[in-house]
Amino acid sequence: MASFPPSLVFTVRRKEPTLVLPSKPTPRELKQLSDIDDQEGFRFQVPVIMFYKRKLYMEGEDPVKVIREALAEALVFYYPFAGRLIEGPNRKLVVDCTSEGVLFIEADADIELNQLIGDTIDPGTYLDELLHDVPGSEGIVGCPLLLIQVTRFRCGGWAFAIRLNHTMSDTLGLVQFLTTIAEFTRGAEDAPSVPPVWQREFLAARQPPFIPFQHHEYEQVIDTIPDDNKKSMTHKSFFFGPKEIRAIRSHLPHHHRSTSSTFDVLTACLWRCRTCALGLDPQMTVRISCAANGRGKHGLHVPRGYYGNVSAFPATVLRAGIISTSPLEYAMEGVKKAKAIMTGEYLRSVADLMVTKGRPRYTVAGNYIVSDMTRVGLDTIDFGWGKPVYGGPARAFPLISFYGRFKDNKGEDGTVVLICLPEAALERFQEELKKMTGEHVDGPFDYKPIKVVSKL
C-alpha cells in the first residue's frame, strides 16, 4: 500500500474567525427542513477539503479575498446557509433566515503542498489545523451552518476546507453551492447557472404515513460491542489503485470478477476486514449501510437546483461470523443487495418512518456505513486556480467511511478510503487488508504523524 509523508513540523497561523454575510439584503423568514433533512442521523457536521496548486496566471490574487467576496455573493442566493436552525414541536428543524452569516477563517501555514500530498493523502491527520473547530460552532441548533477556512501555503498553493451542517444539504447539494461560489470567483455577474431550489416540502412525510419497507438501518438494538473497541479512535487513509482492486477481485469467483463494480468489490473487502478487526461475536448481527443518492431514481422527480438531502442508507444484515469466515462473495452480495434496495419509494418510506418513530438515529451496534464521494464533483470545483489536486472527504467517523478520488505521484487514479477505528483494531484491520491485497500494508506505527503547532 502507499506510503505516508515523513514526520513534519509546521505552524498554522490563523486570524480570528469572522462572519461572512450575504452581500445584499435577503428575506427574513422561517423555512422548514424536509423530513429527510432533520433526521437524527444527519444532525452532525461533515467536513470536506480541497487542495490547490500555485498557478502563475493567478499571481497577485489572494485566495482568501477571492473566496470571501464570492462567498458573500453566493449567500445572496443561498441565504438559508447564513441563518440558524431552531427546533420546533416534535423536534422539527426550521431555518431562521437571520443573515447572521457563516464562519470564515483566514490562515497561513509554513509548509508546502507537496509535503502534505504524496503517494496518498491523509487529511484526517491535520484536519484540525486546516479546519479549526471554533468554540461554540459545533452544535446543530443555534450555530453557524457552515464553517470555512482558507489556508495559504508558502509554496503558493492553498487549501479550502468547509464543514457543513448535514441537515441542510447532502454532498451533491454542497457541491451545487460550491459551484456557485466558484462561478462568482471566475467572474459571473448576475446569478448562478443553476438557481437554487428550496422546496423542502418535496420530501415531507405523507399523510397518512406509509412504510412498506423494512428499514434495517434504523433498527434500535442493544450495543454489545466491547468498550475497548470504542476508545482511542484513530484516523487513517488508504489508497486503492488498479493493482489493489485487481488483487481483491482475485478473491472472488470468476463470474463475479467481471460483473462487480469497483465499489462493490472495495466495500465488501472493507466490511470483511473491519468485521474481523473488531473481533465481533460470530453470532452478532452486523449491517452494511450504503449511502445512496435518490436523484434520478424511479418515482422521485427531484427539482433541478434542489440542494437538500436526497439520500438514504439502505442496509442488509448478516452474522459477523459469516462475513469474517466465509468467502468474500458473501460480503459482496450483501453490499449489492443494500444498493438495490434504494428507490424513490424507499426514500419516501424513510421520510414517513422519521415522523412516525420520532426521527430515530441509524443503528449503531454492528453497523458500518459507507459513503462514496468519488463522483459528486468535489474534485472539479475551480475557484480560478483550476481543479484541485484533491477534492473530497476530510475525515471519517467511527461508523462511517468515506471514499474520495485521488491521483498519486505516478499519475495513477484510484480511491482514497478514510477509516476511523480504535488503535488496536486499526492494526488488525491493516493485517486483514494485507491478506486481501497481497501487498505490504504500513502498520499504524510504521510512520510518525505530522506534528502541527497552531497559533491565532
Swiss-Prot record:
Q: Which domain of life is it from?
A: Eukaryota
What stretch or stretches form a coiled coil here?
none
Q: What is its EC number?
A: 2.3.1.-
Which keywords fit this entry according to its UniProt record?
Answer: Acyltransferase, Transferase
Q: Top-level EC class, please?
A: transferase
Record InterPro entries: CAT-like_dom_sf, Plant_acyltransferase
Q: What induces it?
A: Induced by ethylene in ripe fruits.
Q: Where is the active site?
A: 166 (proton acceptor), 382 (proton acceptor)
Reported tissue expression:
Expressed in fruit.
Q: Which GO terms describe its molecular function?
A: acyltransferase activity
Q: Does the keyword Acyltransferase apply?
A: yes
Please name the GO terms of the biological process aspect recorded for this protein, alphabetically. alcohol metabolic process; fruit ripening, climacteric; response to ethylene
User: Is Transferase one of the keywords?
Assistant: yes
* Purpose: Involved in the biosynthesis of volatile esters which confer kiwifruit flavor. Alcohol acyl transferase that can use a wide range of alcohols as substrate to produce esters.
Q: Which family does it belong to?
A: Belongs to the plant acyltransferase family.
Name by which UniProt lists this protein: Alcohol acyltransferase 17
Q: What organism does the record attribute this protein to? A: Actinidia deliciosa (Kiwi)
Lineage start: Eukaryota, Viridiplantae, Streptophyta, Embryophyta, Tracheophyta
